[in-house]
Amino acid sequence: MIKSQKEYLERIAYLNTLSHHYYNLDEPIVSDAIYDELYQELKAYEEKNPNGIQANSPTQKVGATTTNSFNKNPHLMRMWSLDDVFNQSELQAWLQRILKAYPSASFVCSPKLDGVSLNLLYQHGKLVKATTRGNGLEGELVSANAKHIANIPHAIAYNGEIEIRGEVIISKKDFDALNQERLNANEPLFANPRNAASGSLRQLDSEITKKRKLQFIPWGVGKHSLNFLSFKECLDFIVSLGFSAIQYLSLNKNHQEIEDNYHTLIREREGFFALLDGMVIVVNELNIQKELGYTQKSPKFACAYKFPALEKHTKIVGVINQVGRSGAITPVALLEPVEIAGAMINRATLHNYSEIEKKNIMLSDRVVVIRSGDVIPKIIKPLESYRDGSQHKIERPKVCPICSHELLCEEIFTYCQNLNCPARLKESLIHFASKDALNIQGLGDKVIEQLFEEKLIFNALDLYALKLEDLMRLDKFKIKKAQNLLDAILKSKNPPLWRLINALGIEHIGKGASKTLAKYGLNVLEKSEAEFLEMEGFGVEMARSLVNFYASNQEFIRSLFELLNPKNSDMAEEKQKSSSVFNNKTIVLTGTLSKPRQEYAQMLENLGAKISSSVSAKTDFLIAGENPGSKLALAQKHGVSVLNEEELLKRLKELD
C-alpha cells in the first residue's frame, strides 16, 4: 500500500523500469501477477489523490517506448491498452456503468492472448506496413519480419485503406521446442511465450523470425472507411479476408453469460494451443462505443477480465529426490508456500541435475514458478538479482534416497540401478496400469500406493493374485468398488502384445517402439543386440536397453507372459478401430459428463480417434455434456456433428 507522495513517485519509477524490461528488452524482472498487484496499488493511490497524478505514471500511458533497433512509425489511429478487472465485483461495477446508460448493450467476449500487439496497414489490397503497438501513438516498423508470419495475408480482397490489429503469439508447443533448442545450445531461455514472440518479432535478422513459427490472431481494426454497425460484424469481416478466426468468441447480454464464458475459458485454458491471461470484453454496438469514448489510456467500452495468476515468485528452502520406474532420480524443490491460481504450491520439479546446473539454480534462491493444470509446478529460472550470499550449490546425491544403493551418474541423468528398489517397483506398477500400457481402469497411483503399504503387492504378477478381501482392507473400498477393480484386472489379460511390452517400462522403449517389436512375435525380447539394430528406428541405446532388461528380468518376463497370454498381434484391436465411426476422426469433448472426460477420451482414442481441446472446421464430432458453453455454438457454426452423452454411449455399445 502506498502511503505518501514520496512512495508514489518511487513506485512510478519502479513500474516504469519493469515496463521497460518487459516491453522493450523482453526480459521481465517480475511476474505479471506481481506487476498487476503493484500497478493496482498505484492506481488506488491516484484515485484518492487525483490532483497529484504524474504525467509519467504508467496509468497515463500505453506500455512500451520505441527503441533504436527499428524505425519508428506512427499509427493512423491510436492503439489503446485495456483496463483490467480481476474479480466478479470489479466486473459487475464495470458492467453497471455501461448498462445503466445503455440497457440494450451486448458484449463480445474472446480469449486474451498473451502476445505482442501488431498493427497491419493494407492499401489497395496489399500489406504495406506492420508496426508494433509501442506507446500507442507510434511503434516499431517490423514489416519484413511480419511478412514471415505464415498466417498474415500479403494481399486481401479489399482495396480501401485499413489497419487490422491483432496479437502475435507463439504456440505452447512451439515455445517448448524453441526453449529446448536454446537449452541444448547453452543459450538463455525465454521466460514465457509472450517474450519469445516479442523477441522473435523484433529480430534484426528476419530469417530468424521466419524459423520461430509465429502466428497472428486478429482482434480488431484501426482506421478504415467501412460502415460496420457492430464489433462482431467487424471481426467477421476480418476473417472473411483470410485471417485466422478467434476461438471461443461469444456474444453475451448480461453478467451471468459473461461469467459463464469466463469460467469456460479457465477450464479450457490448459488445453488451449497458446498462452491466455484473461478474457477481453468489448461492447458490441459501435454507436455505444463511440458515445462511451476513452480515458487518458484506455477505451471505456472494453476491459480485460484477468485470469488468476499461474506464475509467482518464491524461495527454494530444500530439495528432495524422487525415484522413477527406470531408476532415474528427479530432484524436486521444496518451496516457501505460494498460492498460484487458487492452489497452495509448496514444491516444484527441477527435472534433473544437468538442468539445475545449466539454469544455475541454487538452494535459497528466489525463483519463478509456473503451474500448468494438475501437473506438478516447475521452476523456470532463478532471480539472481535477489542473491545475498546465503545461496549454495544443489549437490547431486551419491546414494538412492529410498534403498541407499549407490547411484550411477551420467551426463544428464542420475540412476538407481537396484531393480528391487521399492520406489522403482511402485512407479513400474503405476506405468504398468496406465492407459498406453494395460489400461487397468481404477488402478491409479493412490490405490497402488495403498497396495504397497499393505504389502499386498511387490510386482505386476501379484496384481493377478489379489482377492476381494485384500481390496476391502484399502481406504474407501467397499464391495462394489473392490469387485470393479478385480474385474478390470482380469480384463487386462490377453492384451495385444505391444501393450504388454510397453507395460514392462523398458528404458527408451515407448508405445511406438513396442508396436514395432510386437510385429516380430512373442519371443521378440529374446533377440540379440544386432537383431534389434536391424529393426526400423532402433538405435544402439534402445537395443542395449532391451538386451540388458531381458537379461536382468528373464524369469519375471516369462512368468508374466505365461499368466497374461498376450495376443500375437493387435489385429482385433485394429479391426475394431477400422470399423469404428470414430476412426481417424477429430473429436472434442465439452460440458459436464457422467464420467470423467479423460475416461471417454481414452475410449475414443482406443477406437482410433484424435482428441482435441478446441473446435475448428476440421473437427468431426463434438461430444456435448451439460452446460457445453461456447464450443457448442462454434461447432454448430462449423457444421460439426454434435452428440450428447446418450448418443455417444449408444454408438460405443454398437462397437462392442
UniProtKB/Swiss-Prot annotation:
Which Gene Ontology terms of cellular component type are present? cytosol
Q: Which residues form the active site?
A: K112 (n6-amp-lysine intermediate)
Kindly give the Gene3D superfamilies that the UniProt entry links to this protein.
5' to 3' exonuclease, C-terminal subdomain, BRCT domain, DNA ligase/mRNA capping enzyme, Helix hairpin bin, Nucleic acid-binding proteins
UniProt superkingdom: Bacteria
Q: Which UniProt keywords apply?
A: DNA damage, DNA repair, DNA replication, Ligase, Magnesium, Manganese, Metal-binding, NAD, Zinc
Q: What is its EC number?
A: 6.5.1.2
Catalysed reactions, semicolon-separated: NAD(+) + (deoxyribonucleotide)n-3'-hydroxyl + 5'-phospho-(deoxyribonucleotide)m = (deoxyribonucleotide)n+m + AMP + beta-nicotinamide D-nucleotide
- What CDD domains does this protein's entry cite? BRCT_DNA_ligase_like (cd17748), LIGANc (cd00114)
| Presence of the UniProt keyword Electron transport in the record | no
Annotated residues that bind Zn(2+) are located at C400, C403, C416, C421
| Record has Cell division as a keyword | no
GO terms (BP aspect): DNA repair; DNA replication
Domain BRCT, residue spans: 577-656
What cofactor does this protein call for? Answer: Mg(2+); Mn(2+)
Q: Where is the signal peptide, in residue numbers?
A: none
Q: So where does NAD(+) get bound? A: D32, A33, I34, Y35, D36, S81, L82, R133, E167, K306
Q: Which GO terms describe its molecular function?
A: DNA binding; DNA ligase (NAD+) activity; metal ion binding
| Function, in words | DNA ligase that catalyzes the formation of phosphodiester linkages between 5'-phosphoryl and 3'-hydroxyl groups in double-stranded DNA using NAD as a coenzyme and as the energy source for the reaction. It is essential for DNA replication and repair of damaged DNA.
Return the similarity comment: Belongs to the NAD-dependent DNA ligase family. LigA subfamily.
What name does the UniProt record give this protein? DNA ligase
